[in-house]
Amino acid sequence: MNRGAAAEALAARFLASRGLTIVGRNYRCRGGEIDLIALERDTLVFVEVRLRSNDAFGGARASITAAKRRRLERAAGHYLARIGREPPRRFDASLLDALDSERIEWVKDV
């Protein structure tokens, strides 16, 4: 398993332990990708997982740029069109600065 897949697996376990149900992983469409898709009660949660091994370029949080947010929104729109409904939704981030389940930061509404 590569580091990205390991980070996504850690994030999925972390979110599940906080009550979210993972309903999709690595959803891809032309122009975008969503790492994890989850449900928290009736809210669809699109999760970007970011892993950084050091803070040389600002850490995991700084790596979510405006361009990355646009790609997430594009992929989410595609996903919603595919499922044919518009539930309440939000965009979260799971930030890991190492492959350490004790050091995961969950940011809602990025």
Cite the ranges covered by each PLM segment.
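Conserved catalytic cores of phosphodiester-cleaving nucleases, focusing on short active-site segments
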Residues: 34-60, 64, 72
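Solvent-exposed beta-strand sheet faces enriched in polar/charged residues
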Residues: 26, 50, 92-94
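Hydrophobic "anchor" residues on beta-strands that sit immediately upstream
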Residues: 21, 44, 88
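Short acidic/glycine-enriched loop/turn segments that link adjacent beta-strands
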Residues: 30-32, 100
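Domain-level recognition of nuclease-like catalytic cores that cleave nucleotide substrates
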Residues: 82-110
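Aromatic- and charge-enriched substrate-recognition/interaction segments
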Residues: 67
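Acidic-basic catalytic patches of nuclease active cores, encompassing PD-(D/E)XK
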Residues: 1-25
